[in-house]
Amino acid sequence: MSATREREDGQDYRRIFLQDIPLIDVRAPVEFQQGAFANAVNLPLMNDDERQAVGTCYKQQGQQAAIALGHSLVNGRLREQRTAAWLAQCAQWPEGYIYCFRGGLRSQLVQQWLREAGVAYPRITGGYKALRNFLLTTLEQSAELPMVLIGGNTGSGKTLLVNELADGVDLEGAAHHRGSSFGRTLVSQSGQIDFENRLAVLLLKKQHGGCRRWVLEDEGRIIGSNNLPLPVFNRMQQAPVAVIDDPFEVRLARLQHEYIDRMRIEFEQAYGAQLGWQKYDEYLHHGLFAIRRRLGLERFQLLTQHLERALQYQQASGNSDEHQQWLVPLLQHYYDPMYHYQLEKKSQRIVFRGNYAEVREFLMTYSQNNGE
């Protein structure tokens, strides 16, 4: 990339997110960790300590002194190293943009140093703050579209159905968590801001693809450590609900496949047989431990004993059927009564009940009749 092909600074935020245009975030690492975008990489102008020193100088001595300190801190060999990293990223991402917090001094300075090295690279007008505000507005506007929720007991396949439908929005997928005490995945949950940004981009892309209504899983406000954005959650509290009523045996088989068989495979693929089994064992024990108070001490201890026997049998034989000895009472005495109570409060909003296939057919028809 050379200075002869110069692009203007960018403020078409919609295009940036729709096309996953790469972004170089020159904020300090602590700022990036607090919230950023999936299409961004952090190559900071200043590290956290340097940023703190410049910020203190700004408060005590003003802008000019702070700028001078920044230049003295990032100078000589350090400036060369960081410029080399930016140049390498610019070459890898010739269609990208630079941004800092507000599109001000930091991104302007990086832009200037790149230009001195022979590379013209545009920055985002308004910086991170403008991009973030665009996504917050997207969330608010998206929440105004019609919604329908998929309800049903644990194991009903609600998330599966959401992902089958073109206008389905997988909130749990965006949160990297499946909602229950056993809901964590091998992908760590990100912070609240990253979750909101990821969800906003997902909604933006679906609207761009023609979605005019959302199908969502009937969720609580909290998914793992992430909270649903209030505009979305508040609209969900008014949305009609289609309930999957699958037989207990069907739900049990789904849970055994998803939380037992599949998770063992995923842990062992990620960590190898020995460590993977250990982490799989810890994952199941942690899931039970997290709800021990709601289960009561006696039931928790009994289910833990069943779990440990099931793990021993599974490790020895490769057969996971023994896990039903604790999954069945967990459903019957904990998850099913809890969801029944929650669903009763939404009874006036239930528009359809049926098995998985019937709810799927209903939602496809309902989309045509009520999605505009």
Swiss-Prot record:
Per the record, the coiled-coil ranges are none
Q: Which residues form the active site?
A: 100 (s-selanylcysteine intermediate)
Which InterPro entries does this entry report, sorted A to Z?
P-loop_NTPase, Rhodanese-like_dom, Rhodanese-like_dom_sf, SelU
Which Gene Ontology terms cover its molecular function? transferase activity, transferring alkyl or aryl (other than methyl) groups; tRNA 2-selenouridine synthase activity
According to its UniProt record, the EC number is 2.9.1.3
Q: Which reaction does it catalyse?
A: 5-methylaminomethyl-2-thiouridine(34) in tRNA + selenophosphate + (2E)-geranyl diphosphate + H2O + H(+) = 5-methylaminomethyl-2-selenouridine(34) in tRNA + (2E)-thiogeraniol + phosphate + diphosphate; 5-methylaminomethyl-2-thiouridine(34) in tRNA + (2E)-geranyl diphosphate = 5-methylaminomethyl-S-(2E)-geranyl-thiouridine(34) in tRNA + diphosphate; 5-methylaminomethyl-S-(2E)-geranyl-thiouridine(34) in tRNA + selenophosphate + H(+) = 5-methylaminomethyl-2-(Se-phospho)selenouridine(34) in tRNA + (2E)-thiogeraniol; 5-methylaminomethyl-2-(Se-phospho)selenouridine(34) in tRNA + H2O = 5-methylaminomethyl-2-selenouridine(34) in tRNA + phosphate
Q: Which UniProt keywords apply?
A: Selenium, Transferase
Query: What's a single GO BP term from this record?
Result: tRNA wobble uridine modification
Q: Which residues form the Rhodanese domain?
A: 17-140
Family of the protein in this entry: Belongs to the SelU family.
PANTHER family to which the protein is assigned, alphabetical: TRNA 2-SELENOURIDINE SYNTHASE
Function, in words: Involved in the post-transcriptional modification of the uridine at the wobble position (U34) of tRNA(Lys), tRNA(Glu) and tRNA(Gln). Catalyzes the conversion of 2-thiouridine (S2U-RNA) to 2-selenouridine (Se2U-RNA). Acts in a two-step process involving geranylation of 2-thiouridine (S2U) to S-geranyl-2-thiouridine (geS2U) and subsequent selenation of the latter derivative to 2-selenouridine (Se2U) in the tRNA chain.
Assembly and interaction partners: Monomer.
What name appears for this protein in its UniProt entry?
tRNA 2-selenouridine synthase
Instruction: Record the organism.
Output: Serratia proteamaculans (strain 568)
Q: Which gene encodes it?
A: selU
